[in-house]
C-alpha cells in the first residue's frame, strides 16, 4: 500500500465548506445564550465537522522514481528545536538517507531564527545539495535562503504552511497541512463533546506560521459554531515551554476555574500540560499524534481526549527525503505535498498506532520500491 495520501478530496472540501456556511447562518447574536433549537443545530453541525476528519484518508500511489542519480548527494534537515516530534521526523529522514544513498545531516536550533539562519549558512558553505526546514519559516531567515538560491540548493519548507498557501521566495517545494479543515474538525469535536457550551483555552506558538494560522482557523470555526462560548488564545514559547508551561497551566486554571478544555496544539507539550492539570478534570486536545500521547490515551493516563494525528512521525522524515530527491532531479508533482492527518479519539485510537494508519505498516518498503531500490 502507498504512503502518500491526498487528504483534500473535493467532496470532503465541499462538505466542510457547506457545514461551515450552515453554522454561520444559524448563529445567535454573540453573547446571547443559545436556545434549545440553536443548540441542537450547533451540536448537529459540530458532529458533522468532527466526523469528516475521523476517517482514514484515501490512499494514492507514489509515482515510480529512479533514486540512483541522487546517490552521494547531501541533504541537511534543519529543525527549529530538539523536541520529540521533530526528532522522530529527523530519525526517519536519517533512515531514508541510509536507504536511498543520500547523505542526510540533522541540525537542531533552539527555537530562534538566529540558530536556524546559522545552520542554513553552514549548510550553504559546506555545499549542501538540499535543505529541509522543519518549523523554520523561510521568510524569517530570508537573506540566508536567498543565498541558497544563488548556490543552486533545493530548499523545502516542512510543515510551516497550509494547503494552497503561496510558496516563500527561494523555496522549491513545501510539505503542507490541511490546517483549515483540521481546525474546523477540532472545534467540532469540542462543541459536540460540550453540547455547544464550551470554555476553552488554547496554547499555540505565534512564532510558527502554521500554528499561528491554526489558532486563527480554530477561533473562527469555534465562534461560528458557538459565538457565546468562551475562548482564549495564549502564545506558547516554543523554545522554552519545557521549563515554563507547567507553571503557566497551573496559573491559568486558578485564573479560570470554569475552564473545560485546553487545546495545546504542539503535541510535545502534553507532559507539561498534564503535570499542570494534576487532579483536575480539564480535558486536553492536541496535535501531531505522537506515539506517547496516543498510548497514554489508550491507557487513560493523560488528560488528552482528542489528537489530530499525523501519519507516523518517522514516515514524514521519509517523505522529506523523497520530496527532496524528486526535486533535486526536477521530477514533476513534488512541489506541494500534503501531510496525512486524522482526528483520533476513543472511537478510533484502537489497540496500537498500526490500527490508526494500517497503510503505513511497511511504509519503508513502499518508498524503496517506488525508488527502484
Report residues per predicted region.
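C-terminal motif of bacterial Sec signal peptides marking the signal peptidase cleavage site
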Residues: 18-22
Amino acid at each position: 500500500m502507498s504512503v502518500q495520501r491526498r487528504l483534500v478530496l473535493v467532496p470532503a472540501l465541499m462538505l466542510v465548506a457547506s457545514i461551515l456556511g450552515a453554522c454561520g447562518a444559524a448563529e445567535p447574536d454573540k453573547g446571547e445564550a443559545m436556545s434549545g433549537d440553536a443548540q441542537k443545530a450547533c451540536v448537529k453541525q459540530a458532529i458533522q465537522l468532527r466526523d469528516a476528519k475521523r476517517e482514514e484518508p484515501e490512499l494514492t500511489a507514489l509515482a515510480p522514481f529512479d533514486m540512483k542519480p541522487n546517490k552521494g548527494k547531501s541533504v541537511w534537515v534543519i529543525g527549529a528545536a530538539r523536541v520529540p516530534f521533530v526528532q522522530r521526523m529527523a530519525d526517519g529522514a536519517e533512515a531514508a538517507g541510509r536507504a536511498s544513498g543520500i547523505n542526510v545531516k540533522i541540525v537542531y536550533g533552539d527555537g530562534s531564527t538566529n540558530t536556524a539562519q546559522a545552520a542554513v549558512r553552514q549548510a550553504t558553505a559546506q555545499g549542501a545539495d538540499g535543505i529541509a526546514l522543519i518549523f523554520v519559516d523561510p521568510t524569517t531567515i530570508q537573506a540566508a535562503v536567498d543565498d541558497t538560491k544563488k548556490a543552486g540548493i533545493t530548499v523545502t519548507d516542512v510543515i510551516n504552511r497550509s494547503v494552497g498557501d503561496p510558496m516563500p521566495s527561494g523555496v522549491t517545494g513545501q510539505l503542507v497541512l490541511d490546517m483549515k479543515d483540521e481546525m474546523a474538525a477540532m472545534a467540532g469535536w469540542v462543541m459536540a463533546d460540550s453540547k455547544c457550551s464550551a470554555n476553552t483555552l488554547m496554547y499555540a506558538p505565534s512564532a510558527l506560521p502554521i500554528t499561528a494560522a491554526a489558532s486563527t482557523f480554530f477561533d473562527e470555526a469555534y465562534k461560528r459554531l458557538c459565538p457565546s462560548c468562551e475562548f482564549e488564545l495564549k502564545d506558547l514559547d516554543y523554545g522554552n515551554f519545557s521549563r515554563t508551561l507547567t507553571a503557566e497551566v497551573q496559573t491559568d486554571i486558578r485564573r479560570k476555574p470554569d475552564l473545560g478544555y485546553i487545546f495545546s496544539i504542539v503535541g510535545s507539550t502534553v507532559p507539561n500540560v498534564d503535570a499542570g492539570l494534576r487532579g483536575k478534570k480539564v480535558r486536553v486536545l492536541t496535535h501531531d499524534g505522537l506515539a506517547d500521547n496516543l498510548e497514554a490515551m489508550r491507557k487513560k493516563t493523560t488528560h488528552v481526549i482528542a489528537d489530530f494525528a499525523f501519519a507516523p512521525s518517522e514516515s514524514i522524515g521519509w517523505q522529506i527525503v523523497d520530496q527532496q530527491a524528486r526535486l533535486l532531479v526536477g521530477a514533476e508533482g513534488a512541489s506541494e505535498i500534503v501531510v496525512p492527518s486524522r482526528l483520533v479519539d476513543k472511537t478510533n485510537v484502537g489497540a496500537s498506532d498500526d490500527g490508526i494508519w494500517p497503510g503505513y505498516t511497511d511504509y519503508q518498503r513502499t518508498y524503496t520500491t517506488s525508488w527502484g531500490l
